[in-house]
């Protein structure tokens, strides 16, 4: 009977595990690499945000921006997206932005608005037409943005298609580089035959957790 129990246990396939001694060594290695600046998080313009994130955006992390409708989540992410490129020029990185709420054209419009210190209402000649000089500045600034390694997905998609697209970028365009994935926002993700929004968000979280590993 004891022999039978041992044989049955041989068929058990447990989850991967590690002893705390291994985790402790990994923690010390990480701390040493941070001290020696071998690992440097990506900076934003906001010191408080950087401090809350232990110095900035780190690899292998998922960050969730939460707020009521109209509180500026999309504007914050748009600015952060620009900062990651401009303030971390010593890093090779690619930004993949699932921009489901706002067309990529409008995303760039916000960047132009920020850089030129003009509202989008002014840029779009809603009240008064832009002068030729102002239009030239818009064109020059837009040309500089074309070199940024940012890729937009405008069309809302299912969780599976989002997963497929992230995997494609990991294996091709962003191979051996930082890949920053941005999704705005979760409620616009199409259903994969899930019954409610909570299931969609849950599956989406699984995709992001898998991608960060």
Go through each PLM region and give its residues:
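P-loop NTPase motor core
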Residues: 26-106, 154-213
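Charged, low-complexity C-terminal accessory regions
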Residues: 1, 120, 165-167
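Conserved P-loop NTPase catalytic core
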Residues: 80-87, 96-100, 104-143
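Short, solvent-exposed coil/turn linker segments
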Residues: 16-19, 118-126, 199-200
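Conserved P-loop NTPase mechanochemical-coupling segment
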Residues: 136-158
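Short, small/acidic-rich helices and loops at N termini and domain boundaries
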Residues: 1-35, 71, 93
């Amino acid at each position: 009977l004891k022999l039978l129990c041992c044989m049955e246990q041989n068929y058990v396939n447990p989850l991967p595990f590690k002893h705390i001694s291994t985790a402790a060594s990994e923690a010390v290695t990480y701390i040493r690499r941070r001290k020696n600046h071998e690992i440097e998080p990506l900076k934003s313009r906001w010191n408080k945000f950087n401090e809350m994130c232990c110095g900035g955006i780190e690899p292998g992390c998922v960050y969730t921006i939460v707020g009521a409708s109209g509180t500026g989540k999309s504007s914050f992410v748009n600015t952060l997206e620009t900062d990651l490129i401009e303030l971390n020029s010593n890093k090779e990185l690619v930004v993949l932005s699932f921009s489901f709420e706002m067309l990529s054209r409008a995303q760039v419009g916000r960047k132009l608005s920020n850089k030129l210190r003009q509202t989008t209402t002014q840029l779009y000649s809603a009240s008064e037409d832009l002068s030729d000089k102002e239009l030239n500045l818009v064109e020059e600034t837009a040309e500089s943005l074309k070199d940024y390694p940012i890729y937009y997905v405008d069309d809302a998609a299912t969780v599976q298609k989002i997963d497929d697209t992230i995997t494609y970028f990991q294996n091709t365009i962003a191979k051996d580089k930082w890949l920053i994935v941005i999704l705005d926002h979760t409620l616009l993700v199409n259903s994969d035959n899930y019954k409610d929004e909570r299931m969609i968000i849950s599956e989406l979280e699984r995709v992001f957790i898998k991608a960060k590993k």
